[in-house]
């Protein structure tokens, strides 16, 4: 089979541990050919000598400005150039056999290509990584509700990572298959004997890794733990939220002496940090988006043979050594319970082997077996699904102003350097002096 995989995450983001990259790799390892489409070029593109090729939207004709506008949920020009460039790349890379396009998120520049792809005999699969119907309320403007509605109605096959998200996809009467996330065990198996990271230990040492975004990380819950258990140390690994309009996790928690920020760590270093911790944390906020998630970090924590204390995610209770709380005080008790739990490593490894990405790819292949693409007339590019509100437009304008200020600072530095060397006198416009 030939797959076209659309991902809003870069191929190498989070060390390539995320669903779209791992599913694409697993399909390629099974001998299927895969063309992976990411927003902009990854820093690393290791295809492991597999029948696998990676291309970015910006390499297919979408300008950086158009991509940035799409990320803010604003209208972009018709991506017809992208569609033709993509088809040309696809035709060169893949033979003329069964064609399957996988969409992992309702991103406007991707979804608008659906009729164009149908006209070229693609089967359309929507494999939802999250409950994107709940995403806009949390400020994730790149996922348009109308784009997801279109995908849900038009896709030949619907899949989701949790039963909750599958139920949201079934709102128009179709059946959705549940295919959870998986785990790349090799990262953790090859580093089992690595020395633990040298971090400040407490009576209990708690760890977390992931992006520090308020829609996915309950800072108030972690503050409660830090305040009620000052003898415990909490270590947070992850990049800060780049969006200034959202509450800052770091600003909220930096007052606590028993909370330590380590920034983003290479994915291959995560086992060392886990080895230094007693319990790993998944402090999710209480919202619909949380209830639709199947967090990769949970599988990674388990692969490191660590018990997990999570919050507001009842879908995780079926996983071994994952303890889920529904209130702040329950979260404290859950951490203590997890710390007292002895992990049976062999039994856990047997369980995790069944959660491999190869198994997930096999389940996906079963869902598309014997499915015939819906016959549709026309192959036009869809109009934009963007419908930004005033707040979104203001955030975009503020971002442009920040970039302008950064550019002006850069120009002033160049100007000063040039003046010192007797070069050009001015890069920036200046007002004429009054007499």
Predicted segments with their positions:
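Conserved donor-binding/catalytic core segment of Leloir-type glycosyltransferases
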Residues: 198-216, 222-226, 235-237
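Nucleotide-sugar-dependent
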Residues: 14, 18, 213, 266-273, ...
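Nucleotide-activated donor-binding/catalytic signature segment of Leloir-type glycosyltransferases, i.e.
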Residues: 238, 246-271
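A charged, aromatic-enriched C-terminal amphipathic alpha-helix characteristic of glycosyltransferases
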Residues: 340-373
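Membrane-proximal helix-turn-helix segments that form the acceptor-binding/catalytic region
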Residues: 140-158
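Carbohydrate-associated surface elements
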Residues: 164, 179-185, 191
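Boundary detector for helix-to-coil junctions that initiate low-complexity/charged tails
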Residues: 374-435
């Amino acid at each position: 089979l030939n797959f076209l995989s659309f991902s809003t995450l870069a191929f190498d983001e989070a060390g390539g541990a995320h669903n779209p990259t791992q599913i694409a790799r697993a399909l390629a390892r099974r001998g299927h050919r895969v063309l992976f489409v990411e927003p902009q070029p990854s820093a690393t593109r290791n295809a492991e000598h597999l029948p696998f090729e990676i291309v970015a939207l910006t390499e297919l004709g979408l300008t950086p400005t158009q991509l940035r506008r799409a990320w803010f949920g604003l209208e972009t020009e018709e991506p017809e150039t992208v569609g033709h460039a993509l088809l040309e790349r696809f035709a060169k890379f893949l033979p003329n056999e069964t064609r399957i396009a996988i969409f992992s998120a309702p991103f406007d520049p991707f979804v608008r290509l659906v009729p164009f792809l149908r006209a070229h005999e693609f089967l359309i699969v929507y494999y939802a990584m999250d409950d994107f119907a709940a995403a806009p309320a949390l400020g994730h403007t790149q996922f348009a509700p109308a784009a997801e509605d279109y995908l849900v109605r038009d896709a030949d096959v619907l899949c989701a990572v949790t039963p909750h998200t599958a139920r949201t996809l079934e709102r128009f009467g179709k059946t959705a298959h549940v295919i959870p996330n998986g785990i790349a065990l090799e990262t953790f198996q090859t580093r089992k004997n690595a020395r633990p990271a040298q971090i400040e230990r407490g009576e209990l040492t708690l760890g977390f890794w992931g992006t520090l975004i308020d829609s996915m990380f309950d800072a108030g819950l972690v503050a409660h733990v830090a305040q009620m258990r000052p003898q415990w140390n909490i270590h947070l690994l992850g990049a800060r939220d780049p969006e200034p309009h959202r509450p800052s996790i770091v600003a909220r928690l930096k007052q606590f002496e028993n909370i330590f920020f380590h920034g983003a760590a290479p994915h291959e270093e995560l086992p060392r940090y886990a080895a230094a911790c007693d319990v790993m944390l998944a402090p999710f906020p209480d919202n619909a988006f949380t209830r639709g998630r199947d967090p990769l970090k949970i599988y990674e924590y388990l692969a490191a043979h660590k018990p997990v204390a999570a919050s507001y995610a009842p879908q995780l209770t079926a996983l071994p050594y994952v303890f889920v709380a529904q209130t702040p005080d329950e979260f404290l008790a859950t951490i203590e319970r997890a710390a007292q739990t002895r992990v049976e490593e062999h039994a856990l490894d047997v369980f995790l082997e069944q959660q491999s990405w190869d198994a997930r790819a096999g389940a996906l292949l079963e869902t598309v077996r014997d499915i015939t693409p819906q016959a549709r007339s026309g192959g036009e590019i869809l109009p934009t699904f963007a419908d930004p509100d005033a707040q979104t437009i203001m955030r975009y304008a503020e971002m442009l102003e920040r970039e302008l200020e950064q550019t002006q600072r850069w120009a002033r530095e160049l100007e000063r350097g040039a003046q010192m060397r007797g070069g050009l006198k001015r890069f920036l416009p200046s007002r004429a002096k009054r007499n």
